[in-house]
């Protein structure tokens, strides 16, 4: 089967407006979420297509500058969340005495966007976006008469979290944004079949957490995906591994 298309990239957040005298600047816009990957197509008596990769989240917009007098700068925009990876296609049905096709692997989740840097006195950096979840593995194809079921496809890996924005300013430094959490890995596909069931696919690995900006904290690690179940006597797939935590800012 054919491979699913790649998800679209999230849009960048808009810049916050400048504050007037004694007023705060406007908050930067949040980056748009990445588009979902397209599903893989179903294979015909063959292996299912792999899911497409989720789109990356857009970076956050810059915060507005400080107003005249004692105005305070606006907060920087957060990064957009990564898109979910596409699901793998189902394996094709086997002919007589032949096994079904293997399911396609799930697509990787998109990475979270980076938070924007703070601008001006006491301007906080934006938070990093969360990584997208990995796509689900496609189910194994049905075995033909006397044929075994196909293997389930592996789950996609979670996307990495975005980094928090760096605080900047000529006066007191603002606080850095937190790193985004990584997306969870996708589940392995279940095996099916008229004869003996095929083995379930392995779960995808969780993505790594995003790194914090100076002063910020690293994002949490994504959870590993669940292994697919082996129906009809097949072996269950292995669970995916969790991602590594993000690094704290200094």
Write out the residue ranges for each language-model feature.
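Collagen triple-helix signature
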Residues: 1-249
